[in-house]
Amino acid sequence: MATGQRLMRAIRVSEFGGPEVLKLQSDVAVPIPEEHQVLIKVQACGVNPVDTYIRSGTYSRKPRLPYTPGLDVAGLIEAVGERVSAFKKGDRVFTTSTVSGGYAEYALAADHTVYKLPGELDFQKGAAIGVPYFTAYRALLHSACAKAGESVLVHGASGGVGLAACQIARACCFKVLGTAGTEEGQRVVLQNGAHEVFNHREDINIDKIKKSVGEKGIDVIIEMLANVNLSNDLNLLSQGGRVIIVGSKGPVEINPRDTMTKESSIKGVTLFSSTKEEFQQFAAALQAGMEIGWLRPVIGSQYPLEKVAQAHEDLTHSSGAAGKVVLLLK
């Protein structure tokens, strides 16, 4: 390490496994931005389900060990690398990805993954925009090609992506239905765009949903837990209906015939298949949402950096929790 190198606290993962592999270190070198990169002094960092999949080693994209997790940071520009013209020191920003990892006091990010954070949104809310809102927008409008007037069911609507999907769907003039597993979750879903909400812990909710939409069925289902719901989803769809899979924790058995009569489709989505141009499109739409006011991130549990293992544990096992899980670093 070079003499005078600044040090920071950061979470490091040296092996894949459970939450216990998340180790806080206080002697990690502060990264230096290169061309088209910025260094962000992190104020808050979102914790996403995908973070837990990557940490466990079960995700298709495996980082080189050791690594620092974290994609969604919000904070202040500390320094900029060469050929960066859109940002300057002190700018309030949020990200959709990082180069060095967001569970740290400072994070590097490529300049095309960084966006201005409006003054009316605090850093916790800024850390809840990136992956949740960009994923929800991609799922609804890019993958499902949903149109005004269509019905949308968000399965698992009380989490970060689910609430983002409800807000976007309502702003785009869809009929919005949501499911959640707790009374608090159902209340939050109704407050954030859903016309109706159902308890997904009740077997009878399938019949209730069918009654709500009538014989036509549901046009689009945004699915957060496909291994549990996919078979029922296919029976809820309209003619030509689409299930967009955002999350799944395991395999599931379905009857392909359920897709044939209705000519329905099942499509997976991952934010990181988006091109730079698509990210720009998503960002423009979401920036309008911030300006108009329909984009309102909901914050759930908040943890200091040293409690990150607990944050991962709670995110994995506390189904029905409402809002985005956030780490605080200020």
Swiss-Prot record:
Q: Residue positions of the PTM N-acetylalanine?
A: 2
- Species per Swiss-Prot/TrEMBL record: Lama guanicoe (Guanaco)
Q: Which residues carry this modification: Phosphoserine?
A: 248
Q: Which GO terms describe its molecular function?
A: mRNA 3'-UTR binding; NADPH binding; NADPH:quinone reductase activity; zinc ion binding
Q: Where in the cell is it found?
A: Cytoplasm
Give the InterPro entries listed for this entry.
ADH-like_C, ADH-like_N, GroES-like_sf, NAD(P)-bd_dom_sf, PKS_ER, Quin_OxRdtase/zeta-crystal_CS, Zinc-ADH_QOR/CCCR
Q: Which UniProt keywords apply?
A: Acetylation, Cytoplasm, NADP, Oxidoreductase, Phosphoprotein, RNA-binding
Q: Which SMART domains does its entry note? A: PKS_ER
What does the entry list as the binding residues for NADP(+)? 53, 158-161, 181, 200, 229, 246-249, 269-271
Positions where N6-acetyllysine occurs in the chain: 23
Subunit text: Homotetramer.
> Which SUPFAM superfamilies does the UniProt record give?
GroES-like, NAD(P)-binding Rossmann-fold domains
Specify where it is mainly localized.
cytoplasm
Q: Name one GO biological process term.
A: xenobiotic catabolic process
The highest taxon in the source lineage is Eukaryota
Q: What does this protein do?
A: Does not have alcohol dehydrogenase activity. Binds NADP and acts through a one-electron transfer process. Orthoquinones, such as 1,2-naphthoquinone or 9,10-phenanthrenequinone, are the best substrates (in vitro). May act in the detoxification of xenobiotics. Interacts with (AU)-rich elements (ARE) in the 3'-UTR of target mRNA species and enhances their stability. NADPH binding interferes with mRNA binding.
The record's catalysed reaction(s) read:
2 a quinone + NADPH + H(+) = 2 a 1,4-benzosemiquinone + NADP(+)
Q: Which GO terms describe its cellular component?
A: cytosol
CDD domains found in the cross-reference section: zeta_crystallin (cd08253)
Q: What is this protein called?
A: Quinone oxidoreductase
